[in-house]
């Protein structure tokens, strides 16, 4: 969807990601797939390169921007990051962190929904265009006592979200257990 929104409407997708390694890996994988229009702004990036990325995002040369919630929320005005670009989508990657880390460890995750709501309102007033919020995770608990799904939906102020629940067991992953007995060779089961 991010590439479609960029190519068809020149809209920007902001991906909120918890770890620098994930951001760098996703940008690198897009580059390997010959999509050079995704960048990240994080503490691994030099100030000069950050400024260059910000200018190119603003100029419409980059269409997907990976940042942390702290980077987004530390800017009182998102235009410091994206200039006059119109947001087409905000993606919250590893969305279970909104509730698991957001309450104590990384509170900017917990306040992300309020900030996204303000961004949406401002963009609607200024450009008469809203944006999609999409969340992705493989580890959220759905319903029950520790219901991360509904807590995340509520924290991010998502109204009537479209939900896809996939199968958690993957056929392409095998688990091998090697038992080692004292002073004996390893045998496989």
Residue ranges and their predicted role:
Residues 45-48, 64-73, 179-187:
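Short glycine-rich substrate-engagement loop in P-loop NTPases that contacts/grips substrate
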Residues 122, 129-132, 136-189:
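Interdomain hinge/linker at the junction between the two RecA-like core domains of SF2 helicases
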Residues 20, 40-50, 69-75, 165-168:
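Conserved helicase motor
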Residues 62-63, 70-73, 77-128:
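SF2 helicase catalytic motif II
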Residues 12-18, 66, 133-136:
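Conserved RecA-like ASCE P-loop NTPase motor core of nucleic-acid helicases/translocases
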Residues 22-48, 52, 56-59, 150-156:
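Conserved helix-turn-beta segment of the N-terminal RecA-like "Helicase ATP-binding" lobe
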Residues 5-9, 31-33, 55-60, 80-85, ...:
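Conserved catalytic network of the ASCE P-loop NTPase/AAA+ motor domain
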Residues 1-37, 42, 122-128:
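Conserved SF1/SF2 helicase motif Ia
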């Amino acid at each position: 969807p991010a590439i479609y929104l960029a190519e068809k409407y020149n809209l920007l997708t902001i991906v909120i990601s918890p770890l620098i390694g994930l951001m760098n890996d996703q940008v690198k994988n897009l580059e390997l797939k010959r999509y050079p229009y995704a960048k990240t702004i994080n503490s691994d990036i030099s100030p000069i390169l950050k400024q260059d990325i910000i200018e190119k995002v603003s100029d419409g040369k980059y269409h997907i921007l990976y940042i942390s919630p702290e980077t987004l929320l530390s800017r009182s005005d998102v235009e410091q990051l994206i200039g006059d670009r119109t947001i087409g989508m905000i993606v919250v990657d590893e969305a279970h962190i909104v509730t698991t880390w957001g309450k104590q460890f990384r509170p900017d995750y917990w306040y992300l929904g309020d900030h996204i709501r303000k961004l949406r309102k401002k963009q609607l007033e200024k450009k008469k265009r809203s944006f999609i919020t999409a969340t992705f995770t493989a580890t959220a608990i759905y319903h029950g006592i520790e219901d991360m799904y509904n807590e995340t939906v509520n924290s991010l102020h998502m109204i009537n979200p479209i939900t896809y629940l996939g199968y958690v067991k993957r056929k392409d992953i095998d688990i091998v257990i090697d038992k080692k007995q004292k002073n004996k060779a390893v045998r496989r089961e």
